[in-house]
Amino acid sequence: MLELPIISITIFLPLISVLYILLFISQSKKPDKQIHTMYVAVLSSVLTFISTIYILIEFDSSNPTYQFVERYSWLDKIGLEFHVGIDGISIFFVSLTSFLTLICIIGSLFTVKKYIKEYLVCFLLMESFCIGAFTSINLLVFYLFFEVILVPMYIIIGVWGGENRIYAAVKFFLYTFFGSVFFLLSIIYIYSKIHSFDLSNIGEFTNNFPLHVQQILWWAIFIAFAIKIPMIPFHTWLPDAHVQAPTSGSVILAGILLKLGGYGFLRVLLPLLPNASQEFAIYVIWLSVIAIIYASLVALAQKDMKKMIAYSSITHMGYVTIGIFSFTDSGVSGALFQMLSHGIISSCLFLIVGTLYERLHTKEIAKYGGVASKMPVLATFFMIAMLGSVGLPGTSGFIGEFLSLLGIYKVNVIATFLAALGIILGAIYMLKLYKEVMLGEITNKEIINFRDLYIYEIISIAPLILLIIYFGLMPSSILNVFHLSVENLLVKFF
């Protein structure tokens, strides 16, 4: 294997591009500097995506430990190191981040009308910070990346969002920042006792903390990740953020940022505090079941397409948390698969809604109807994405939900049957959405002038559609990669 600092390259390439844009292109007096910025952003995202493909190709799925490990001293006095690596749990999140960022940047070139340079800079920053969070093996560095992601997303919602964008951006920031404060206090306490931030081994020490200490730390860390995922009752920021965010912002929010919550449970909470995790697991499971049913019922009542998809995200992430806290191989594997699948499906749905919004400038369901007669390609894409969201066998959405339910069935049969109701409710509201938007007669005269997808829209949506089908038909291509890492986590701590 070629010895390259490939993870550092993947993390810092977008940051270097941002510096180049700000220091050189911004100061240039040439009239084409906006086009120059676009070229740099696209090139950066392409190269970052290529580097993640290289990691995927070279990754050894038979090795459950961290690979491509890099360790550089940063602040010796407190043991702070830039310590990064990739295992089966993190590898697909890194790939998903670079893939969705590339799609968003390409799409933004045609849809963003103001401050395009700043917009692209925010997306490159988010790409760098997300990859940093998914690859960090140092707890404090993970926290720093986890926290700083707030800034570019806050700006994206607040500057390029809808009419109530400031309210949504502030609500998003305050919710997430509130949870992060408790997370930071927990990190400080842990370091004061064991003088280490190394995620690869500090669980061996924190596991020996008195149970009451573990319980307090558990709730403090749990809240931070429960807000991010989000779980009820910490969910109210998400619908507002999705409705007000621009299309690409919703793609990154649903496709990547929500996954940081589930990833945090697996990477931080469970390994650091396994005893407390087992004690409180039943509460998380029932909270997840409530979230699945509640969010599904609320989604049924929505009149805004993006808000309906936002509540469906809460439902889907509920399956993630019941899978994780089942502490079973099938449950945790299902949770990981569900996170990857949801990242693809929800991104696809938000892009589809974005194409409709670009034409009619409204997300209100009642304003549509009969769109399929004018946009058959979009209607086909929408159908596949909708069926994936419902969890139809043959799509990626089925595998994650099935494995998560299989995992929880081994723990609590009643919770399994109640959680399965979410699948039925999901089918009802998603089929209702498709029927009201795509089928029937055209009632809005503006729809008569609709033209089908442009090339750049097909380029953005088609790869996601192919992945929904491919992962649904070939789930082993994903499951085999993270199986040993999941098994290693469960055997080591549970």
Swiss-Prot record:
The keyword Transmembrane applies. Keywords: Cell membrane, Membrane, NAD, Quinone, Translocase, Transmembrane, Transmembrane helix. It is a multi-pass membrane protein. The lineage of its organism: Bacteria, Pseudomonadati, Pseudomonadota, Alphaproteobacteria, Rickettsiales. GO terms for cellular component: plasma membrane. GO terms for biological process: ATP synthesis coupled electron transport; electron transport coupled proton transport. It is found in: Cell membrane. The chain crosses the membrane at residues 5-25, 37-57, 89-109, 115-135, 139-159, 172-192, 216-236, 251-271, 280-300, 308-328, 334-354, 375-395, 411-431, 458-478. It catalyses: a quinone + NADH + 5 H(+)(in) = a quinol + NAD(+) + 4 H(+)(out). The keyword Cell inner membrane does not apply. This is NADH-quinone oxidoreductase subunit M. Its main location: membrane. GO terms for molecular function: NADH dehydrogenase (ubiquinone) activity; ubiquinone binding. Belongs to the complex I subunit 4 family. Pfam families: Proton_antipo_M. It comes from Rickettsia bellii (strain RML369-C). InterPro entries: NADH_Q_OxRdtase_chainM/4 (IPR010227), NADH_UbQ_OxRdtase (IPR003918), ND/Mrp_TM (IPR001750). NDH-1 shuttles electrons from NADH, via FMN and iron-sulfur (Fe-S) centers, to quinones in the respiratory chain. Couples the redox reaction to proton translocation (for every two electrons transferred, four hydrogen ions are translocated across the cytoplasmic membrane), and thus conserves the redox energy in a proton gradient. Its EC number is 7.1.1.-.
